[in-house]
Amino acid sequence: MANLRDIRKKIGSVKNTQKITHAMKLVSTSKLRKAEEVARNSRAYALKLDAVFDDVLSKMKNQGIEDIQSKYFRELERLEIKKVDIIFITADKGLCGGFNTNTIKKVLACTNEYKEKDIKVRLRGIGKKGNEYFSFNGIEVLDKINNLSSMPNYERAQEFMKKVVEDYLSGKTDKVIIIHNGFKNMITQEIRVKTILPIGYQIIHQNPQPSEAQETITSEPSGSEDEILDSLAEKYVEYSLYYALIDSLAAEHSARMQAMDTATNNAKDLVKTLTISYNKARQEAITTELVEINAGVEALK
């Protein structure tokens, strides 16, 4: 009978866990819908910003301005890279499947790839899980910030990028990339690697959706060319990080929703298995008791 009590306890424990994971799935689903809407709107703004870049560059070239002196812009193919900063974005919480692990693996892969080319790499971390991993493994992270990936905030992202831009303009780094797990759809996330500094001319055209972004854009640049481009570049770099944070958050909720759905289904299967084991054990106990009773009756005859 002790075995039956143990199985009953296990069934009760698994059912409680099932309720928790199901509730977490519902919460993640609700948060995902909101995050997806924010990501969609932010994507539209990012396309508008790209369109402004394209429009200004086109007008400058039409005016005969071919050589751009701004430090933000470089021909990436001709640039000699010696130092790279990697900004990675992970979640502040777990229970989201391989969401954080996949990002960390990509960061490590990129780091090793650069080091094989004798390129110095510095890490800048956003998200508790990623920062904890690298800290635990003795890997230095230059800047660490938590509670930003779970609550994207433009001002905090802007403040974070100020240090990055200062290091880039002062020559402490030659290239800055962002690595994060992005939202593709309700059930799929994908690792994204984006170079944000220097801004190569081809980056402006990496989102070829002119009907969505360029249709209503009309810009009249005033002031020096470098001032215009520097101002736009600062906004572009800041918003690139902010959009990555929003994209990452939507992907995180998607991954957690899937993970909790899988956990809930696994709990259901485990309850079924334990219930079968319980019924078998109960039947065996009843059979044993009947055999013992019959044996006792026979002994009394």
From Swiss-Prot:
<dbReference type="GO" id="GO:0005886">
    <property type="term" value="C:plasma membrane"/>
</dbReference>
<dbReference type="GO" id="GO:0005524">
    <property type="term" value="F:ATP binding"/>
</dbReference>
<keyword id="KW-0406">Ion transport</keyword>
<comment type="function">
    <text>Produces ATP from ADP in the presence of a proton gradient across the membrane. The gamma chain is believed to be important in regulating ATPase activity and the flow of protons through the CF(0) complex.</text>
</comment>
<protein>
    <recommendedName>
        <fullName>ATP synthase gamma chain</fullName>
    </recommendedName>
</protein>
<comment type="similarity">
    <text>Belongs to the ATPase gamma chain family.</text>
</comment>
<keyword id="KW-0139">CF(1)</keyword>
<keyword id="KW-0066">ATP synthesis</keyword>
<dbReference type="InterPro" id="IPR000131">
    <property type="entry name" value="ATP_synth_F1_gsu"/>
</dbReference>
<keyword id="KW-1003">Cell membrane</keyword>
<comment type="subunit">
    <text>F-type ATPases have 2 components, CF(1) - the catalytic core - and CF(0) - the membrane proton channel. CF(1) has five subunits: alpha(3), beta(3), gamma(1), delta(1), epsilon(1). CF(0) has three main subunits: a, b and c.</text>
</comment>
<keyword id="KW-0813">Transport</keyword>
<keyword id="KW-0997">Cell inner membrane</keyword>
<keyword id="KW-0375">Hydrogen ion transport</keyword>
<dbReference type="GO" id="GO:0042777">
    <property type="term" value="P:proton motive force-driven plasma membrane ATP synthesis"/>
</dbReference>
<dbReference type="InterPro" id="IPR035968">
    <property type="entry name" value="ATP_synth_F1_ATPase_gsu"/>
</dbReference>
<dbReference type="Pfam" id="PF00231">
    <property type="entry name" value="ATP-synt"/>
</dbReference>
<dbReference type="GO" id="GO:0045259">
    <property type="term" value="C:proton-transporting ATP synthase complex"/>
</dbReference>
<keyword id="KW-0472">Membrane</keyword>
<dbReference type="GO" id="GO:0046933">
    <property type="term" value="F:proton-transporting ATP synthase activity, rotational mechanism"/>
</dbReference>
